[in-house]
Amino acid sequence: MQHETKMENQSWLKKLARRLGPGHVVNLCFIVVLLFSTLLTWREVVVLEDAYISSQRNHLENVANALDKHLQYNVDKLIFLRNGMREALVAPLDFTSLRDAVTEFEQHRDEHAWKIELNRRRTLPVNGVSDALVSEGNLLSRENESLDNEITAALEVGYLLRLAHNSSSMVEQAMYVSRAGFYVSTQPTLFTRNVPTRYYGYVTQPWFIGHSQRENRHRAVRWFTSQPEHASNTEPQVTVSVPVDSNNYWYGVLGMSIPVRTMQQFLRNAIDKNLDGEYQLYDSKLRFLTSSNPDHPTGNIFDPRELALLAQAMEHDTRGGIRMDSRYVSWERLDHFDGVLVRVHTLSEGVRGDFGSISIALTLLWALFTTMLLISWYVIRRMVSNMYVLQSSLQWQAWHDTLTRLYNRGALFEKARPLAKLCQTHQHPFSVIQVDLDHFKAINDRFGHQAGDRVLSHAAGLISSSLRAQDVAGRVGGEEFCVILPGASLTEAAEVAERIRLKLNEKEMLIAKSTTIRISASLGVSSSEETGDYDFEQLQSLADRRLYLAKQAGRNRVFASDNA
C-alpha cells in the first residue's frame, strides 16, 4: 500500500512538472516581482496619503485655532459683561445721576418711545418703549421688584460696552436687551421714533427668544445665525448671546453681532498665502456662512448629498476628513463657536503642491519600473519559450522515429521497463507484441525506398489506431514494430494482435499512379502470465521467436504460443 502511494505521488509530481514548464516558472517569478513592487509602491502611497491628510488637518487646525482665539476673546467679554450686570443688579451704585435716571424712567415709562441719557462721552443711552407695548409681548414683563436696579445696571453696562467696543474688533454691535421694554446698544438710535421698531426687532430674534428658561435650561452662551431676507439690504450676521439672570429671574439678554464679512476677512488674513485650498465656515446646521475665496465665495458649496455625508461624518468626531470625488474635505468643530470650519482641497491644487509632485514622481517611477519589468519579461519569456520549443523538438526527435512518429527502440525500452515494474508491483499481466511486415524488402526493391517509407508510415498509423489508450508502440528496426500492453493478458494481447493483422491486410494503399498494394504482417505475442517473468527483454525475445514461427508457418498470422 505504501509503495502504491509513493508511485501515485511520483506520478502526480511528474504531471505537475510537465504543467509547470519553464514559461510558467518565468511568468510566476515576474508576477511575484511585480506584485511585491506594486505592494511596496502602494505602501509608499499609503504613507504619503497619511502625511497629506495630516498636513491638511494641521493647516486647518492652525486657522481654526486663530479663529477660535478671536471668538473666545469676544465670548470672554460677554461673560465679563454678564457678571458685571449681575453685580449691578444685586448692588447698584449709589450715584445721584443713576437715581435721577430711575426718576426719569418713572416719568417717561408710559410714553410710546423714550430715551434716558446721562453722559454721551462716558455711557450709552437706554432706549425703551411704553408699558402698554411691553404688555403685548409674551416674553416681556415689567413686573419685577428690581426694575429700578435693572435700569441703573443697564446704564453701568452701557459704560462697559462703550469701553469694550472698538473698531479693531470683529464685533459690529454689542447690546443688552431687557424683557422690561428697553435696550442698550453700541449702535445709536438716531431718532426716538425708531426705538419701538428696533426693540421689537431685537426681541423677535432667535438669539433673544432662544434664551427663555425653557429654551436654554443651562443658561449657557449660544450662537445664532441670521440670514437676510431677499428684499432686505442687510447682510448675514452671527450673534453670540447669553441670558442675564439673578435670583432665578430672567432679566434680558447680552449679545454681540459679528457680520459674516468680517469673519471672511479674518479667514483670509489667517491663511498662509503660499497654501492652496478654500476655507469655509458653517453654522451648527451646516448652513454656509462664508468662504476664504474672495473671487468665488460659493465656488465649492456642497450639494445636499455631500452635506449629508459630511453631517454623518461629523456625528462621530469633532474633527476629521472625507474624500468627495476629486476633493479632500477636512473639518474641525470650533470650541467657542457653534459651527464648523471646513477646508476644501481640490485635485488640481493637490497636484500643484509638494505632495502632488511626490505622487507624480512615485507614479512615474512605478510606471517606469513596471514597463522595464514587462519588457524584460517579454524578452526572457520569448527566449525561454523558443528554448523550450527547441528542447521539446530535440527531445521528441531523440525519443521518436521521424518516419512513423512512433517511439524509437531506445525510447520504447525506457518506457517498457517502468511499466513492467509497475505491473509486477500490482500483480497485473504484462504482454508484448512483435510485428514484422511481410515481403517488405520486395516492396523496396520493386517500388523504391519512397514507397517503402509510405508503407512503414501507413502501417504505423494502422497499428496506433488498433491500440488501447494505455498501450505503447514503437519501431524497433527496419520493418519491425513492437507493442507493449500493460495490464493485458495473453488472450487479450492476442486479440489486439489479430486486430492489427486484419487492419493491415484489409486496406490497400496507393504506391504510385494506378498502383495499389495490400500488405500483411506476421505477429508474435508473449505475456508475463506464461512464466511470471516481467523482464521486458525476455518477453520481447519470446514474442520475436513466435513472430518468426508465424513467418515460417506461411506469414500473415498471429502466434501467441510456440505451438500455435
UniProtKB/Swiss-Prot annotation:
Annotated knockout phenotype: Deletion of the gene increases swimming motility and early biofilm formation. Disruption partially suppresses the reduced motility of a pdeH disruption; concomitant disruption of dosC, dgcE, dgcQ and dgcN completely restores motility, suggesting these 4 genes, together with the c-di-GMP phosphodiesterase PdeH, form a network that regulates cell motility by altering levels of c-di-GMP.
Record-annotated GGDEF domain positions: 428-563
GO terms assigned for molecular function: diguanylate cyclase activity; GTP binding; metal ion binding
UniProt-recorded name of the protein: Probable diguanylate cyclase DgcQ
Residues the record lists as binding Mg(2+): D436, E479
Taxonomic lineage of the native organism: Bacteria, Pseudomonadati, Pseudomonadota, Gammaproteobacteria, Enterobacterales
PANTHER family: DIGUANYLATE CYCLASE DGCQ-RELATED (PTHR45138:SF16), REGULATORY COMPONENTS OF SENSORY TRANSDUCTION SYSTEM (PTHR45138)
Site residues by UniProt (Transition state stabilizer): K441
Binding positions for substrate per the UniProt entry: N444, H449, D453
